[in-house]
Amino acid sequence: ANYPSTDPNNHQNYSADDYRNRVLSDKTEPGSTMKPFTMLLALDKGVISATDDELIDVTERVGKILPDNKYFEMTIQLILEKSHNLGTIVVSERLENEDFYNSWNKLGFGKSLGLMPSIENPGQLRHYSKWGLSDKRSLSFGHGPMTTNLAQLARAYLIFANDGALPSLKLIKNTYDDQMQQVFTPESTQRIAEILDSVTSMKGSGYRAVIDGYEVAGKTGTAEMVIDGKYSKDGAKRTYFVGFSPVINPKYIMAVRLDYPKKCFVSWDPTLRNRCEGSNSAAMAFQKAMERILINDPEIQSKLES
């Protein structure tokens, strides 16, 4: 779905850009919505355990990312709950460039979905042989040598509904996909899904996506707008939330992207008044849209009543 919408009966009131399908045609940096995949790769490769007693040291500077002096050691769950860049980068340093590239390639990034080829922009995934020193670090939290469209990002999250395997996207309901590619192990996928459940708790950055009475898991993301090939100088943001429900065997996955969000929810802190992030914009849009879907799904409702 795209908004603002257009009225074909009054096409003279719109420009060609108004008719653009932004879900397929816009290539963007997905920001922190990619952090779960970094942790999945690390868990599969055995460089983390993602247990409650495993602690990641976040006291040392890595590249341009400085310690925030708020945390000294963090669990993987806390890193994802707080969307902590340095913690994610520390984990990424344990991984090989080739493994990153291969996993992101299997997730479909940089490749056409084949849904509507005439309008789709598949983005890019630069080959690891052309990466600089900072590219792996940037890639670990959704920046650097990759761009993607929103449909590709939503598709990547389908692994949480398919035990780590990636199906193709379909426009026709109930068509069977017998060529799913296994990207991550079922065990690792289930563990990270459990952690994403905590991201939408009151402790996590996605708590505004919580829907009372329903299971929801997901991840926030924020990226600076790229205008004419350069990051915006006026602080323009693009915010994301990608989530799914229920947490175990999800039936619905939704990806939300907001461009130039201007009115973002803030609480008591006046310094955050103009600070738009996935947590206080896209997560709220997700909450409203997903809630309407869940309360109108007879199957979901019958399970709640049983």
Q: Can you say where each PLM-predicted feature lies in the sequence?
A:
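A hydrophobic, small-residue-rich beta->alpha segment in the mid-to-C-terminal subdomain
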Residues: 261, 271-273
